[in-house]
Amino acid sequence: MRFLKLKEVMEKTALSRSAIYRKMSEDAFPKSINLGDRAVAWVESEVDDWMEEKCQMR
């Protein structure tokens, strides 16, 4: 399992920071994991699965 920081998620998905957090609040994007003081990350496989779902919806 690999964690992605926000910058990596933004690069991987081409989404902005605000779009990622908006989609999370709408339950339309994987939730972040709290790693400690002001540090969050996403599970890479969950982000990959989300991207695959988007591709299949076209």
Regions found by a protein language model. Give the residues of each.
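Polyanion-binding surface elements
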Residues: 1-19, 46, 53
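Amphipathic, hydrophobic secondary-structure cores in small proteins
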Residues: 15-19, 30-37
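C-terminal structural segments of small proteins and small subunits
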Residues: 26, 35, 39-57
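Flexible, active-site-adjacent loop/turn segments at secondary-structure boundaries
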Residues: 1, 8, 27, 31-33
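Base-recognition residues in the alpha-helical recognition helix of bacterial helix-turn-helix
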Residues: 22
